[in-house]
Amino acid sequence: MSQNASVGIVMPQKIPFEMPLVLENGKTLPRFDLMIETYGELNAEKNNAVLICHALSGNHHVAGRHSAEDKYTGWWDNMVGPGKPIDTERFFVVGLNNLGGCDGSSGPLSINPETGREYGADFPVVTVKDWVKSQAALADYLGIEQWAAIVGGSLGGMQALQWTISYPERVRHALVIASAPKLSTQNIAFNDVARQAILTDPDFNEGHYRSHNTVPARGLRIARMMGHITYLAEDGLGKKFGRDLRSNGYQYGFGVEFEVESYLRYQGDKFVGRFDANTYLLMTKALDYFDPAADFGDSLTRALQNVKAKFFVASFSTDWRFAPERSHELVKALIAAQKSVQYIEVKSAHGHDAFLMEDEAYMRAVAAYMNNVYKECQQ
């Protein structure tokens, strides 16, 4: 497996949809755009397409670089590319930025066609079901009747799961990684605290901060810092930073003293420079609302009854945000519904963020599963 290979320089595409999209909350987007990137080639049978669904802070830029000078590759470059687990020499891979995002798809930074101004806080709350509906429109646009696989980690895994329920005939395989069939009470609480940090920032201006030439940087920074802590494992964080100080002794003040504090401030500042606060609010609400069993008498097994897809489910031993027990819930429901499922729990010291990292056992498991997906494409 060539982990050094790359898809190279890639160019995003903005796909316009001049059609209304009725959302789960009853509101309608009169039109919408989806920003996408594609890697590899769609075969003549159009049966080798793979959709990558992103997590809270992800986007369409899954792999490669936008220019030779680009310092960073896409957020899942170690997973997607030539000879990698999701092999672009075999598959036509599609990444997109979801509705409500801040990287080119319709969202708070977009122009509201009804007012001629940015949506800002007026962009409607969207759900995982809404995203899947818009992704189905994208599949139609690309001429893809059925995805060979839909792959996602965390919030992305929720989208993969919802696809199998909303459009059972259009998905052959779903890879649900470091995810859950619904958020725990604790996770909903974490999301609310993060939102409160943003909503109570004096620069938030009821979500119309850009028209006031302000940014709720303090609130968004705190939200990201808190979130980042939950994505890491205690032991991994301890091994990386311990109680190391930036100077030789305590300063007996409230500035940055510990190395871990410096790291979190850096992560918060970096996030503020690339992400929109209204988008953060929308993404966390989509997480909170996801609960496919709710439409089936709170029975996940019943929700999965009409699913046609085969499943690959992966969790990570030290992930406490989306603990292995949450994946077990999905696996047990799939078995009860008599569906095909393969499961792996990966031993890792990296917590929830492990799904983004290069772990040999994890990568080999995904590669082996995707190899079987490819064999199906050849039949």
UniProtKB/Swiss-Prot annotation:
Query: Which GO molecular function, any one, fits this protein according to its record?
Result: homoserine O-acetyltransferase activity
Q: Where is the AB hydrolase-1 domain?
A: 48-357
So where's the catalytic machinery, residue-wise? 154 (nucleophile), 319, 352
Q: Which GO terms describe its cellular component?
A: cytoplasm
Query: Which Gene Ontology terms describe the biological processes this protein takes part in?
Result: methionine biosynthetic process
Write out the annotated subcellular location: Cytoplasm
Q: Where does substrate bind?
A: 224, 353
Record EC number: 2.3.1.46
Main site of residence?
A: cytoplasm
Matching InterPro entries: AB_hydrolase_1, AB_hydrolase_fold, HAT_MetX-like
Q: Which Pfam families match?
A: Abhydrolase_1 (PF00561)
Q: Which UniProt keywords apply?
A: Acyltransferase, Amino-acid biosynthesis, Cytoplasm, Methionine biosynthesis, Transferase
Pathway(s) the chain acts in: Amino-acid biosynthesis; L-methionine biosynthesis via de novo pathway; O-succinyl-L-homoserine from L-homoserine: step 1/1
Q: Which reaction does it catalyse?
A: L-homoserine + succinyl-CoA = O-succinyl-L-homoserine + CoA
Purpose of the protein: Transfers a succinyl group from succinyl-CoA to L-homoserine, forming succinyl-L-homoserine.
Q: Which family does it belong to?
A: Belongs to the AB hydrolase superfamily. MetX family.
Query: What HAMAP family does this protein's entry cite?
Result: MetX_acyltransf (MF_00296)
- Describe the protein's quaternary organization and the partners it interacts with: Homodimer.
UniProt cross-references to PANTHER family, sorted A to Z: HOMOSERINE O-ACETYLTRANSFERASE
Q: What is this protein called?
A: Homoserine O-succinyltransferase
Q: What is the lineage of its organism?
A: Bacteria, Pseudomonadati, Pseudomonadota, Betaproteobacteria, Neisseriales
